[in-house]
Amino acid sequence: MKLSFLIISLLLVINVNAQKIDKVINAAEVERIEKTLSSDDMQGRKTFSAGIDKAGDFIASEFAKSKLAYLDGAKNYFQEITMVKAKAVNITGTLDAEPLNSNNIAANTTAEEININSLTDYEVVVVKAEDDFSKTVFPLFDIKKNLLILVDTAHARRFKGMQRFTSNAKFSAEVSQVFVLTSNLKPASIKLRIKNQLTEQKLKNVVGLLPGKSKKEEYVVFSGHYDHLGIGKPNAAGDSIYNGANDDAAGTTAVIMLANYFSKMKNNERTLVFVAFTAEESGGFGSQYFSKKVDADKTVAMFNIEMIGTESKWGTNSAYITGYEKSDFGKILQQNLAGTSFHFEPDPYPKQNLFYRSDNATLAALGVPAHTISTSKMDSEKLYHTQEDEIETLDMNNMSEIIKSIAISSASIISGKDTPTRVEKLK
């Protein structure tokens, strides 16, 4: 008789909690937020645009509805980031007898002027024809030295992309990487002068806090990025706006809804941090900046949410976790979902290196169990980075179930009962 009473009581508690979460996290609310963020009015939410500012204001207004607190010392929900754009106004020089100009030079720099008068001024790196361009070049940006990078003309197409990449705004830096497209990989001399026009540009993350109770100094982060690709050339249907409904208005929608849910539950012993990152699409600058301002050692977990608008390869009621094997984060989440129909799986696309391709990467590199939750079929995502990534292609009911499952699965982490094992730091 007592056992029957306990079972009935437990079922009643589960039912009451289910009703509570359904009132806050449901398909109608998902659609309201998603529809706003991915609307044409947001102009594709490109960095440094009126559209992304409008999106940021909307996210901040939603955080205000949930009565989230500001970051310590902040006067609003915006975490402002100063970037520097260097536009070359004059490039002159020679590599041996070969003229150097805007056609064969790309400089990743925030210096007003660059002068290279010999091959000993900068450390020389050679990218040969047979080298993998990405694997050879991108690690160079982490080296705190001035580099002169000679790129074989076999990589001419990738070099053009590098010119576009280096022209973007970036964090101010004391070192520069200068790329030269040339067939002369063993030069005897160089003379190069680059004169730049520098312009400051502002970005902003949107950040709100739900202070904890007994473990207030420990942080759990819920994040997604709210930027996308903006406006481009019209497609065959005449659509020029990259709405980014799935990438990543979907993740940002989840962050807003989780903030609202937890603010109503008031059951977090740890402090919860809700972040909508900027500039993920253009280099992850928002999450990089955030990781420098938060104490990684006190950050016990990060739920980064990216592209959850479509069904996963396993169908509805499922999602995958990147870097599943790097901590016991995923196992904890699945344990908290016992008795439900939802299941988390390890990332099925290891060749895509997704763990280090989203906003979780910078905190993960510092040892935080920071993982991305997604449903995107990355080996066959036809609408990825296209104008067709519209709200009509998303499943609101499934999104709602995913967001509920993130809320439920995080319970023992936000309560302080469980602490995921740390990720190995990148050296």
Show the residue positions of the predicted features.
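Active-site metal-coordination/substrate-binding segment of hydrolases
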Residues: 102-146, 217, 223-263
